[in-house]
Design a protein with these regions (language model features):
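Conserved RecA-like P-loop NTPase helicase motor core
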Residues: 479-490, 541-643
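Signature of the SF2 helicase/ATPase Hel1-core->accessory helical subdomain module
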Residues: 80, 86, 106, 110, ...
Length: 682
């Protein structure tokens, strides 16, 4: 539907009628594809997939946003790609598909190119990864020419071969080296001199004019929408009025991340050092006093933060050992010290700006001093709106960070994704937190986090269950006799490892063990490594290539892989290498400022926040086991809190939410079931 589509339809009402007629015609095309054409192409008929496509078209006809939980195996990517690609063609407009992982982006690239020929389409497709995935030629040249640098051969050879993305370079290239040569601070204005040789520049430029399919991450789409809502030019062609958010259970976290500011002590000292270097041709002694004052104020403020962190660690319950975020106490001297630090940074920045204005004829860059000025502006805004902000502290080794974001993430998500001219399709395998009640009740936690407009403006779909035969192919084992994992943590680790070894003996390895805390994972790995077990024990390594560890796990069929974080949802391993998923501890959220704020505004903190968070992550973890129609195996939950007697308040809602209904608390029954599986006999 290009400009010719509107010829003769001058009023808004006429255009709406013409658009709806086009969508009705598209609905017929979708039906024809699934009922007549897909079988001719040898595509497997999946009821949930077809229903999903038809419901998306209905939502578009009714001018509604649309949310759907689509179980593993229904083919949700094809389910939304068919109507979305046809929409792009018929309306001659770009469509944007955003995910939360690079793995799904790359899979969608393959899926789009598989679906288009089936529909007789040939749309432009742009894969827009985050900027740090791309080589910056300018930074690479500077690094290669730096006499103090020692560029590894993998980098030299890759550049000579013309590699432009991180995935092109060998895995042995250290991430620390890549961070010295990748794109870090892109802008169309400042990077214009590189437009002919920078792949990322070409990608960003093409996004402005495409009328095809844009595949990006949720962070990038959020930044695009934030610009549009501020009345600025977006990052993508503004004609795009259909958005798809896959892995939508992460959307509120991604939007929160996009609105989060963080300032570390090391970062601020680095800015001051760089700003002073920019004054190398001037008399630096004239601003050395302001520099000392700023550095002293920074040290005083961050020492206060470190003291707060240590106090919380000393006084906290066992759960605090898992914390990544610590609470910021704004009732003491911290606000006064923050105000003094901000004033000192502002004074230093103002003094440096005077020199930069004197040097305008030389057209030299004073980027670091501009950065200091931006820090001061951000901190001033924080102090002005402190009651509207969530503030916390993060500790990374010796570096301490002040981190903050607006409290009203729900309102921000709603304004960005549901209050513009665009219509948004949201999907995930884990959007619901209950299986009974009204659709609003089943999707209640998702709605509370995103402000999805259920009703006239938004359609909630009946969840589409996975077609996989879970109860024939899988069984869940749960414990009822172990120590409490938080109140009796040391005893839990000891007894939990003993139970883990019993479970591993049933499957002879072949297991993915999921942890909620890195410290638990490392402790269990240390214990298992000393046991001289008949299978290799692997562990997710910080900074290592995920592909390398996963490939080793796949190739060594009986190996055991310990993981946390992204391993709960970011991996897909088919076959008998993964025949046993072990949940070492129920994934309740760790108490932190974000969770505590959600709890503070909930009627029932446990049932309205902590349990839904746990259920969604537990469903993600269990979903690692059955990835196709032939996969079989067991899931083992080493946590007594799902025992039948005495039941916890969340006992029934948790069990009802899980796709595998076949369960036992007997290791003997578990062994008998596993030994009867085809994979155990191979």
């Amino acid at each position: 539907m290009d400009n010719r589509f509107y010829f003769g339809f001058n009023t808004s009402e006429e255009r709406k009628k013409r658009r709806k007629a086009e969508l009705y015609s598209m609905s017929e095309q979708v039906s024809t594809f699934f009922w007549d054409e897909a079988p001719q192409h040898g595509l497997e008929m999946r009821e949930g997939q077809q229903d999903m496509s038809f419901e998306i078209v209905d939502a578009l006809i009714n001018d509604q946003h649309f949310a759907i939980e689509a179980g593993v195996g229904i083919g949700k990517s094809f389910g939304y790609l068919v109507p979305v690609l046809l929409y792009s063609k018929r309306m001659n407009k770009p469509v944007i598909i955003a995910t939360s992982t690079i793995a799904l982006q790359e899979q969608l690239w393959r899926d789009v190119h598989a679906v288009m020929p089936l529909l007789g389409l040939n749309r432009d497709v742009i894969l827009a990864k985050g900027q740090t995935h791309y080589l910056c030629n300018k930074r690479a040249d500077e690094y290669m020419c730096d006499p103090k640098a020692d560029p590894p051969d993998a980098l030299k050879e890759g550049i000579q071969q013309g590699y432009e993305e991180r995935k092109d370079f060998p895995e042995v290239l250290p991430q620390g080296v890549w961070d010295k040569v990748n794109v870090q601070r892109f802008s169309m204005k400042n990077c214009g001199s590189c437009e002919k040789k920078c792949k990322y520049y070409k990608v960003r430029a093409s996004l402005k004019y495409t009328d095809g399919v844009v595949l990006c991450n949720q962070d990038f789409l959020t930044q695009h929408l934030m610009k549009l809502r501020r009345g600025q030019e977006g990052l993508i062609n503004a004609a795009a009025d259909l958005l798809v958010v896959d892995e939508a259970h992460n959307l509120d976290d991604k939007v929160r991340s996009a609105t989060t500011e963080r300032f570390g002590q090391g970062m601020l000292f680095g800015m001051i050092k760089s700003a002073f270097y920019e004054l190398r041709s001037f008399d630096q002694s004239s601003v050395s006093g302001e520099k000392r004052e700023a550095e002293s104020a920074i040290i005083a403020f961050y020492n206060c933060l470190k003291a707060q962190v240590q106090k919380q660690i000393n006084e906290a319950e066992q759960d605090m050992r898992y914390a990544d975020r610590f609470f910021f106490d704004n009732n003491g001297s911290a606000i006064e010290l923050l105000t003094e630090m901000n004033a000192a940074i502002h004074n230093l920045s103002s003094s440096i700006q005077i020199y930069s204005s004197m040097d305008f004829r030389n057209n030299r860059s004073f980027a670091a001093s501009d950065d200091l000025d931006a820090v001061s502006e951000s901190l001033s805004e924080l102090l002005d709106r402190i009651d509207d902000m969530l503030i916390w502290i993060e500790q990374h080794g010796s570096n301490t960070e002040l981190v903050y974001c607006p409290k009203n993430t729900k309102e921000i998500v709603s304004r960005l994704y549901f209050n513009g001219d665009e219509r948004t399709i949201l999907t995930s395998a884990t959007l619901t937190n209950a299986t009974s009640g009204s659709l609003e009740e089943q999707y209640s936690y998702f709605i509370s986090n995103t402000g999805f407009p259920a009703g006239d403006r938004g359609c909630l779909s009946e969840p589409k269950p996975s077609p996989y035969p879970y109860d024939e192919h899988a069984m869940i084992y749960y414990c009822d006799d172990l120590p409490h994992p938080t109140r009796e943590h040391e005893a839990f680790i000891e007894k939990g490892v003993e139970r883990l070894l019993e479970i591993l003996s049933i499957s002879n390895g072949k297991a993915l063990v999921l942890f909620t805390a890195k410290t638990d994972m490392e402790e269990v790995y240390s214990i298992l490594s000393e046991k001289n077990l008949p299978y290799k024990i692997l562990m997710q390594q910080p900074g290592s290539s995920q592909d390398k560890v996963l490939n080793e796990f796949k190739e060594d069929t009986n190996s055991v892989l310990l993981g946390t974080g992204a391993y709960w949802e970011g991996i897909s391993i088919e076959g008998k290498s993964l025949s046993n998923v072990i949940i070492f501890r129920l994934p309740f959220p760790v108490p932190d400022p974000i969770i505590e704020y959600k709890c503070s505004v909930a009627k029932d903190a446990l049932m309205d926040v902590r349990v839904p968070e746990m259920i969604i992550k537990l469903k993600q973890g269990i979903g690692r086991l059955i990835r196709n129609f032939t996969d079989t195996g067991i899931v083992c939950i080493i946590d007594r809190r799902l025992r039948d007697e005495p039941p916890e308040r969340y006992h029934d809602i948790t069990w009802d939410s899980l796709p595998i209904k076949n369960r036992t608390s007997s290791l003997g029954e578990l062994r008998k079931f596993y030994e009867g599986l085809p994979s155990a006999k191979e």
